[in-house]
Amino acid sequence: MKPSIKVIIPAFNEADAIGHVIRDIPNIVDEVIVVNNGSTDDTQIQAEQAGATVLFEIKKGYGYACLKGLDYIEHLNKKPDIIVFLDGDYSDYPEDLTTIVLPIIEDHYDFVLGSRTSGLSEKGAMQPQQIFGNWLATRLMKLFFKSSFTDLGPFRAIKFDTLKQLQMEDKTYGWTIEMQLKILKQKFNYTEVPVRYRNRIGVSKVSGTLKGTIFAGIKILTWIFKYSIKSCF
């Protein structure tokens, strides 16, 4: 039986990119859910015109937007089998979604991460602070949890039932690392697949600003050390 797949895209002022993202998503997806995270541009209009379901979340934060999308799904009569998370800036290649969900469909993995560290990334697409942050976080996860993750990339797929069991809570920059740490902690089956990555449209709201970079770094380290301490008891 064909699995039901829904995509959640948090978006803040991505009017120039969001339409491209939605239109490039493969037709194996049942529904594309864009969470307009307080945008002041035409993100909502562009997303609706491209055929997405658009929700509005006034509280700023990547986690807030993701949780809004999950709350919407929780209230649907028919729940999906797989949830895919994807950024709205067109840095990921939405066409790679078929590659990301395949290990869940064919090999019964619970979680699949699209890794940007496999040499498929466009030159300059990942900023130095992103590269260093990824390296540090994945090294720490390997040290504390024997993890094989190589990236914290936002392009990922997860079984809906698995996602519910994770009981996600981070509201801002720590959403991605929280998910990966809980996958490790609860011993779900996971794998990575290489994905392409290009220079985004517009300026990054996280790594493109000093404030965003600092707060993201603090969040990531906080989650890692929080779970490393828990693992000792």
Give short role names for the model-derived ranges:
Residues K2-I5, D24-I33, T53, D81:
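Short loop->beta transition adjacent to catalytic acidic/histidine clusters or analogous donor-positioning motifs
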Residues F12-N27:
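Short, well-formed alpha-helical segments that are part of the catalytic scaffolds
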Residues N36-I45:
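A conserved acidic beta->alpha catalytic loop
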